């Protein structure tokens, strides 16, 4: 009876210190190689602007594009005509062609001014062919541009909210050409992890083999898992649908601290651990005060000159420098509490974390972006 009680107590203690792995589906961890969006781009014209279009004297390509379009419609513009247009803007149109898209489907497009138009709000995009990297036309875009910004100007004053030189057209492009694909034609499909991890790649491979049979999946490297699939489109769809929903017990990832040197942001995951250390951080500030002193002659007609003499004063102040103890912190809450106790700004915290890593007190990978 006593032995059974000790075993029960030991199991309870182990459950307190064990960090459970989170269960996720394979579909949340991988992408299927070859199943991706394809970028499309085109050049077009937006018309119907209320005097906020391109200034054609400064953007000659707008006038040239309009002349070419009119000639295609059977309207000839005499050479040398100076068209003073204010309601036309040259734009670049971009879109993403989803995988397995079929002719007749519609996709969203983004319209961005490339001239000096003040706003394309309320404009209409004329028919614009969208091409892929192979210079083939895959979609045609046209429609009214929706701009999320707003602005007004009067009497030399202006106010603007958000961006007025770009907008979107929901379902503004119709797919005219289907993208050729060789997906699954050789009976092999590669699954790519969202981030490289040898352990996770082997776990995904083992999980697929347990459900679909040994040899169905093989981990090629830290990111790629090669899967043997049955031939035939419907069979492959069912096969992928089954393996995408297989649960995987994902172990906690590497301890990592991300520092954005431009914004001063510091982000860390739950696996970051701090060892005991002492930190002293001093703030050094330099103040430069410059004043111009004007010296003028006492008599207006004495022949003297007015002299401007700069008077510059520089002062240096250093604050802080008190040595503070940082206790060992085994979890994220304690890490945050320990770092906050230093009272450092985000900029100072970046230097402190770098020094902690060099001293071996920060048990995490430090990445600066």
UniProtKB/Swiss-Prot annotation:
- On the tree of life, the source organism's domain of life is Bacteria
Mainly localized where?
periplasm
- Recite the UniProt keywords alphabetically: Bacterial flagellum, Periplasm, Signal
Example GO CC term: the record gives: outer membrane-bounded periplasmic space
- Localization per Swiss-Prot or TrEMBL: Periplasm; Bacterial flagellum basal body
Classification via Pfam families: FlgI
Family statement drawn from the similarity comment of this UniProt entry: Belongs to the FlgI family.
Annotated function: Assembles around the rod to form the L-ring and probably protects the motor/basal body from shearing forces during rotation.
In its UniProt entry, what is this protein called?
Flagellar P-ring protein 2
Q: Which species?
A: Yersinia pestis
Q: Which gene encodes it?
A: flgI2
